[in-house]
């Protein structure tokens, strides 16, 4: 019980810290064209929380057009996508300690590089030196998703897939509990 309470307190503190960081960086109270969204998922006793902007297709060519292949993308709109882990996890088999990170990607035609970056920022100041982890995953063709969405699927008490889905591309990323 004590371990659960400690993890919960760390998670809540991390959320407040990350929200305070974003609040300090925002310089306007205007409504964004791409609305902000968040998703939270529990895997076992581990909480995973993301905040991101949801851009729309709006009849544009997305991957290979608006979002070029082979270039770092902040994985959303408005600001960098933030991801918080209440406990250590494995992303595609690689250890990521509990904490708050930025999620960047490098889209490709058939595979994407998933980047876990130590620095929380607006998203335009990406610093490769702050990368904690880079893994490669396969992208899949899927049904059309007008607004970008990040969600979880195939969740068990040990693992699940974080999915980045926009236009007709979906990118599943395996996340499992660390021992």
What kind of region is each of these model predictions?
Residues 16, 96, 107-109, 143, ...:
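A cross-taxa feature marking solvent-exposed loop/turn segments within ectodomains of secreted
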Residues 73-122:
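Mid-length scaffold segments of soluble, non-membrane domains
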Residues 24-68, 123-179:
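Primarily secretory-pathway and cell-envelope proteins
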Residues 1-25:
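Bacterial Sec-dependent N-terminal signal peptides
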């Amino acid at each position: 019980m004590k371990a659960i309470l400690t993890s919960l307190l760390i998670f809540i503190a991390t959320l407040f810290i990350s929200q305070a960081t974003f609040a300090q960086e925002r310089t306007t109270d205007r409504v964004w064209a791409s609305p902000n969204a968040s998703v939270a998922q529990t895997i076992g006793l581990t909480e995973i929380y993301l905040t991101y902007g949801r851009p729309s297709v709006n009849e544009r060519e997305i991957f290979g057009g608006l979002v070029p292949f082979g270039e770092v993308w902040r994985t959303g709109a408005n600001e960098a996508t933030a991801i918080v882990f209440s406990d250590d996890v494995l992303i595609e088999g690689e250890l990521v300690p509990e904490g708050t990170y930025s999620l960047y990607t490098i889209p490709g035609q058939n595979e994407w590089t998933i980047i876990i970056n130590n620095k929380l920022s607006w998203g335009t100041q990406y610093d490769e030196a702050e990368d904690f982890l880079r893994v490669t995953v396969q992208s899949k063709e899927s049904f059309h998703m007008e607004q970008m969405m990040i969600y979880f699927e195939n969740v068990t008490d040990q693992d699940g897939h974080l999915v980045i889905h926009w236009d007709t591309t979906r990118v599943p990323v395996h996340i499992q509990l660390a021992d």
